[in-house]
Structure formats: structure tokens, C-alpha cells
Amino acid sequence: MTDEKLIRGIGRWDLTAVVINCIIGAGIFGLPSKVYAAIGVYSLLAFIACAVIIALIVLCHAEVASRFTATGGAYLYAKEAFGSAGAFEVGWLYWIVRMSTFAANCNLLITYMGFFWPAATGPAIRIGLIAFVVVLLTVVNIVGVRQSIQLTNFFTVGKLLPLLLFVLVGLFFVQPSNFQIGPAPEYTSFTTAVLLLIYAFVGFEVAVIPAGEMKEPQKIIPFALFVALAVVAALYILIQVVSIGTLPGLAASERPLADAAANFLGPLGAGVIVVGALISIMGNLNVGLIGGSRIVFAMGEHREMPAVLAKTHEKFRTPYIAILLNAVIILVLTIQSSFLSALAIATVTRLIIYATTCLSLIVFRRRPDAAPAKYTAPFGIAAAAVSIALVIWLVTNVDFTKEGLPIIVVAVVGIVLYYLFKIFRKSAAI
């Protein structure tokens, strides 16, 4: 199987921008207050813990990704390491995560628009705005990956500038007296805070999915992953420092960055942060559509979903059927849903998918016929083992009824669909 019917238009710094855009989403605009309410100034340690956990997982992704040039990401790695059934389950879970996350973030986008235009949250205007956003991003993605990536680069710059302004100006207004170190948090509180914060660091995996549209993906993926994670981790920690140091009522804030900015930049500063949030969410929506559609495209190529999903546009050479399918489902989900507290479910599901990629590193290292790695992770086996152990630690601390059960149900549905497709393929060509 080859991806050469797709245009390889994504370069090193393009991909770095994509990774940053994927990671920095709506989470960082709301989570600083949530983790501070849970564990106080120890939230800074939680940010560092998250950065270390994700760094280990990224290390595994970088090596595994360097073995492939095709589109598919974790789905493709699982297919080579564990076979079709495991790959379908990974692809299915990830597709569900991407669509539901898009729907939630799109609703959040409308909520933020309401800061400047209260009528935006009205039923009719809300539906119209949702449709406009989905159609706009769909057209951009169908017209070409180059145009989509250029839009992503714009969103990356647009979201980083307000955040950098927040940090660079806010550091001069930090009050050391706000950093009161109390008793160490309880184990469960710290674990919950870390799991909550992981959401702010996820999304990097979207960047490795469209490898078939990258220039020298085996070289640029490791570079982009490490550079982007370093930038994001440093920025997040500084954001938390400024939030704690400038906003005494941080624990009770619903818009912590906007409220903190209002303290040292005035109402205009709060408005700038809201604009940054809008740009950030739009950027995530764009790369989410890229990642979600490419997962379905890859599954269509492997005949684990209808082959029509692998069709590419004759002129633009983009997987337009997969993009359109994602757009239609996303539109319906977004209109009929709201921005609910599904953060833990999405995070836990992603962590499970990450664990499969870490496990595949061990499998490929021990398989003599595996494609050679263009990047070898230092202490790769140990990093993979520790990553898997950390995922198990986090996953076993979730509420089974609220998060565990829904994930199990979705996973079982995926298994049923896999065997239904398998039976159908035997009786007729898809």
C-alpha cells in the first residue's frame, strides 16, 4: 500500500506548528483554576509530572513513527504490531474521540463568541455559526493539505501571541505572597489533577497521522514532536505561574486566564485572551478534521471500513469522501450536543491508544522483519514500559461508572463492527 496519491506538502516547521496547534487547545484556558482548586501551588508539580509522562510517550511515538511513511498513525502502528482486529479497535476509538472532541470544542467556540456577541448562543444563530465553521474547514481541507496547513500555521501564531503576551507581561505583576505552600496534597487529589492536566497535553498524535502527506516523515516527525512538546511544556508552566501570582481568586475562576489578564491588562487584556481562545479552538478544530478524516482514510485503504473512504479527489488529491463523512457526523453531533464534561473520557481513551503505540515499540524492536527505525529512542524499551505503567496508573484512578463504563461500551461496539465488516467483506466486495 502506498500513499503517493496524496501530495507530500507538509514540511518540518509546518509539522511543528501542527503539533503545537494540536496540543494547545481549549484546555489551557480553563484548567489552571481547576488544578489549583484541587492541589494549590502543587499544581506546578502536576504540570511538570504531565510533561514528563507525555515526554516518555512522545519518545515512543517518535521511534515508532520513524518506521513508517504511510498515513494512519496509531491505527497503522497497531495494524503492523497486533493485526487487523487490534488496529480496527484503535482506529475506531480514536475516530470517536476526534469527532466528539470536535463537537465539544465547536460548542465551546460558540460560547466564547458569546463574550463579544451574546446573540451567538441563541438557538438559530448557534446552528448557523456551527454550520459555517464546519463548512469552512471542510472546504479548506478538501481544496488541499497545503492550504489546510497554511491555515493551521496562522492559527498557531494567532493563539501563541496572546498567550506569550499573558506570560511576558504577567510575570512583572506576579505577587510572591500568592505562592503559599500548604500541606502536601493527598495521593488521590494529585492523581486526579494529573489526569485532568493530561488533557492539556494530548493531541500531538494527530500530527503523525497524515504521514503520507509529509516531506521525509521519518525525519521530521521526531523533530516536530520534541520541539513542540518543549515549547508547550515551558509555556504551560509559565502560564500557571502567572495565573497563581496575579489572580488571588484563581480557584473559583471559570475563565482564569481572562480574569488574570483583566487584573494586570484591564478589560482589553481579557478581550485579547478571549480572542486567543477563539483562535486556539479554531486551530484545534482544523487539525482535528485533518486527523479524524485521515484515520478513516487509512482504515478504508486497509478495507476495514468501506473502500470508498480511501478515494482521493482527482484535482486536489485529498481524501474528500473521508473528510465529508467526518464533516456530516461532526455537524450533527455539534448541533445536538453541548460542551459537557467529557474531558476524562476523552483523556482516558487517548491514554489507552498511547499505550498501544508504546507497546508496539517493544514488539517492533523484537521483530526482525520490522521496518527499520530512522530514529532510535534512547532507553526505548524502558521508556515504553514506564509509559505503559504510568497509563495503567492513571486509568485505574478514574471513576468506573462515569468514565470506565462508557469507554468499555464504545470498545465493544467497535469489536462488533469489525467482525460485521469482516463477514460482509467475505460475501461481497466493499
In which residue ranges do the predicted regions lie?
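Membrane-interface "cap" regions at the ends of multi-pass membrane proteins
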Residues: 1-33, 37-42, 54-59, 71, ...
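Helix-loop-helix junctions that connect adjacent transmembrane segments
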Residues: 2-6, 44, 120-125, 154-275
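Hydrophobic transmembrane alpha-helices that form the core helical bundles
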Residues: 34-38, 46, 55-134, 138-142, ...
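TM-loop-TM module centered on a large, flexible mid-protein loop between adjacent transmembrane helices
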Residues: 76-77, 114-119, 226-286, 304-341, ...
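Membrane-interface loop-to-helix entry segments
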Residues: 110, 124-173, 184-186, 225-228, ...
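Alpha-helical transmembrane segments of multipass membrane proteins
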Residues: 112, 116, 135-139, 167, ...
